[in-house]
Design a protein with these regions (language model features):
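C-terminal peripheral helix-coil segments that are non-catalytic and often amphipathic
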Residues: 173, 177-220
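Hydrophobic/aromatic residues within well-ordered alpha-helical segments
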Residues: 15, 69, 94, 132-136, ...
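Short secondary-structure transition hinges
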Residues: 110-138, 150-151, 190
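Basic, helix-initiating cap at the start of DNA-binding domains
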Residues: 1-30, 34-46
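Short hydrophobic clusters on alpha-helical segments that form packing/core surfaces
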Residues: 19-27, 73, 90, 129
């Protein structure tokens, strides 16, 4: 019985991956908005209902890998060692190279470049991305509130979560911009993500009180 369940679960994972891979290929070839779910189902040799059983929306076919990111991010903050701050745990996780930036796979770099261009050209995908990160921010805020025993109505957990996720979103935008260039230098991009991300986090640690204050001459 256990063996049958194992085979069944593997079959489900294989089907899910097949659908995701098929969708990604078609989206890159034709553009996200030009590919209906029916075409994905036909290419993957499954029904439309099966596609939606695995992916609630067409947009989720693009962002399906982000579920694991959310789980791992929250775990990194929640399970941080004693004495480590929330911002330090967040930075340690977010600034760690992953995917293409860690492996340097040329095929992965091409896929990431193509996906970045596809997302940038699709209002539907950009809107879905905003929804996903809003959910992440809410989850992080809830974790921070619980971790700090914040009272109901305390805005600091939400403000902190928005600030931290703002750094992450800014780094994503930075990487996407770098991928639009002629030559993609993985080592340089990874180093800049770490350095620029740490700069942004350091700013949050120091506080915004004097950031951008003008001097007597009017300069910053």
């Amino acid at each position: 019985m256990d063996r049958e369940l194992g085979l069944r679960e593997r079959k489900k994972l294989q089907t899910r991956q097949l659908i995701a891979d098929t969708a990604r290929r078609l989206f890159i070839e034709r553009g996200f908005d030009a590919v209906p779910v029916a075409a994905i189902a036909r290419e993957a040799d499954v029904s439309e209902a099966t596609v939606f059983n695995y992916f609630p929306s067409k947009e989720d076919l693009v962002y399906q890998g982000l579920e694991a990111f959310e789980t791992e991010l929250l775990a990194a903050v929640r399970d941080r060692p004693a004495g480590e701050s929330i911002i330090a745990a967040f930075g340690r996780f977010v600034l760690e190279p992953r995917g293409f930036l860690a492996a340097g796979d040329e095929a992965a770099a091409r896929l990431l470049t193509q996906a970045s261009k596809m997302i940038a050209s699709s209002p539907a995908l950009l809107a879905r991305e905003q929804q996903i990160y809003a959910r992440y921010t809410a989850s992080l805020a809830a974790l921070i509130a619980d971790d700090t025993n914040a009272e109901v109505g305390d805005l600091r957990p939400r403000a902190a979560a928005n600030a931290l996720m703002g750094v992450h979103r800014t780094l994503i935008d930075f990487v996407r911009c770098q991928l639009t260039g002629q030559a993609v230098d993985r080592v340089r991009i990874a180093a800049e993500v770490k350095a620029r991300g740490q700069q942004a986090l350091d700013l949050l640690v120091a506080g915004l009180g004097t950031y951008g204050a003008k001097s007597a001459t009017g300069s910053l």
